[in-house]
């Protein structure tokens, strides 16, 4: 009962890594309908569009060099009616661009712009050329708004999209960097998609869940982790975030190798609720292949 045409919102402008993830998602879910990819200026706008049922969204979640994209993590925790149902990995490689016809033979000392994560992933190139980092809302925006005499860092697709000259290729500090994205939808839609995947026996799932202990005192976190261990739930990631406006209170975000409909998971959640802890599922998606460290 999905629409023939659906909107898929991503962080614009065209040419962001999120745009690449959105194109991958549109291919992956082509059986559900045709997608119109729509660029929005920021993640709050994406969350708003998804929760008001205008379509689905794609948000950056975690980078294997920089870690979690914290504002997006907070946005999903705070969203009353959005959850993730697919996880998509995009390889992150940066080129350095200049305005066509204004080639910089020596870019030393010039301003360089990219998304803050982009600047953080190209520190060697920036230092080598003594460039002055200036953060932009996205790598693609840095490329789109590039002025003569300046440098922008972004995915190779930006060169074609914005008609730029490539000053240097693969200027990132680490090869093999990738960013993981979540495809998000209203919570009831995610439940329906998961029920469909579950009934098709689509294999194993992962769940991202946030816990907020409502009681404080020694051992609260240890008790929570004991429940997960005793249920045989394998945890692949665990981080804490302060709860805004409530000093000393934290939410704990765990990624688990299990689906919420598995009996051991349900039992663990009931026990955690019995301790007086609040839990909210942020995403459930088919398990990724992970290389052994």
Regions found by a protein language model. Give the residues of each.
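Domain-level signature for soluble enzymes in the chorismate/prephenate branch of the shikimate pathway
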Residues: 1-293
């Amino acid at each position: 009962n999905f629409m023939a045409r659906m909107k898929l919102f991503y962080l614009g402008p065209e040419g962001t890594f999120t745009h690449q993830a959105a194109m991958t998602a549109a291919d992956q879910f082509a059986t559900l309908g045709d997608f119109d990819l729509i660029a929005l200026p920021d993640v709050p706008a994406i969350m708003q569009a998804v929760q008001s049922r205008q379509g689905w969204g794609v948000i950056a979640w975690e980078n294997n060099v920089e870690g979690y994209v914290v504002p997006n993590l907070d946005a999903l925790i705070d969203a009353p009616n959005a959850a993730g149902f697919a996880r998509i990995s995009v390889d992150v490689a940066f080129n350095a661009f200049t305005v066509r016809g204004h080639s910089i033979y020596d870019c030393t000392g010039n301003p360089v712009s990219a998304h803050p994560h982009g600047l953080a992933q190209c520190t060697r190139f920036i230092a080598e050329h003594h460039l002055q980092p200036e953060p932009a809302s996205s790598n693609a925006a840095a490329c789109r708004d590039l002025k003569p005499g300046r440098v922008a860092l972004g995915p190779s697709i930006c060169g074609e999209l914005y008609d730029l000259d490539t000053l240097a290729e693969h200027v990132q500090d680490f090869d093999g960097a990738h960013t993981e994205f979540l495809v998000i939808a209203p919570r009831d839609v995610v439940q329906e998609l998961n029920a469909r995947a579950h009934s098709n026996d689509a294999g194993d799932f992962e769940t991202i869940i946030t816990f907020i202990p409502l009681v404080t005192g020694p051992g609260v976190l240890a008790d929570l982790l004991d429940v997960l261990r005793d249920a045989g739930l394998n945890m692949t990631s665990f981080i804490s975030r302060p709860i805004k406006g409530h000093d000393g209170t934290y939410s704990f975000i765990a990624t688990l190798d299990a689906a919420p409909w598995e009996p051991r998971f349900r039992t663990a959640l009931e026990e955690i609720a019995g301790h007086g802890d609040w839990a909210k599922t942020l995403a459930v998606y088919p398990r990724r292949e992970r290389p052994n460290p």
